[in-house]
């Protein structure tokens, strides 16, 4: 979920309610996208938003756009964003060396390696409202060419995510009902990025160096081309929950969820 699309952010510290997951350790953070907006009866509204940012330290830059058209019963929207940054730099040198472990690839002593990233997000949404009933459908696409991690041995060098979300929300005399169905497909690739050693084994070591590596061949017990990890995942699920009003101060909350990985 892109930050510009966040509508509500809830934080549960410590014990988490079952309705919010219930299986968290230490707490739960729930991020909800913006609720669809509808026009007054007999009217229509059109909205748009443009945004951009730039930060000098790591040349971080990004932009976002959103457009929306709605009547009193229909809403269609699109949002897109992009964000990219290079490695960031510290206030002064914090290393006594320039090498990264890869022959010929050095970093300035004040540069924090493996902190760069590049990501793009797009979402299309449809919503229909009839009295106290709401139907929503969302298509999402995320393309992340790389996300480097300074505190991990591996980096994410490609990630593509496609998602479909359907939702029904209704208000009744007895309470409320919320039902969802969703599917997410992810193509994920991790390996060592440019700021980490990429080739392993005796056959890859630079002569006279104990820290630098170089390309080697053929791949064998003495030559390893990094540690590529390709993952293809699909998650599908449905959830239903209802709040039954028992009295002025009492609510019975029931629900169920089924998920397949």
PLM segments and residue spans:
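Membrane-embedded beta-strand positions in outer-membrane beta-barrel channels/transporters
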Residues: 8, 13, 28, 47-51, ...
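Solvent-exposed loop segments that connect transmembrane elements
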Residues: 90-112, 191-228
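Flexible loop and strand-edge segments within Gram-negative outer membrane beta-barrel domains
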Residues: 115-119, 132-177, 185-206, 224-232
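Periplasmic-side early beta-strands and strand-to-turn transitions of outer-membrane beta-barrels
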Residues: 30, 37-38, 45-159
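Outer-membrane beta-barrel strand-turn architecture
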Residues: 70-73, 127-132, 170-174, 243-248
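Outer-membrane beta-barrel transmembrane domain signature of Gram-negative proteins
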Residues: 211-261
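A beta-strand signature from Gram-negative outer-membrane beta-barrel systems
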Residues: 3-49
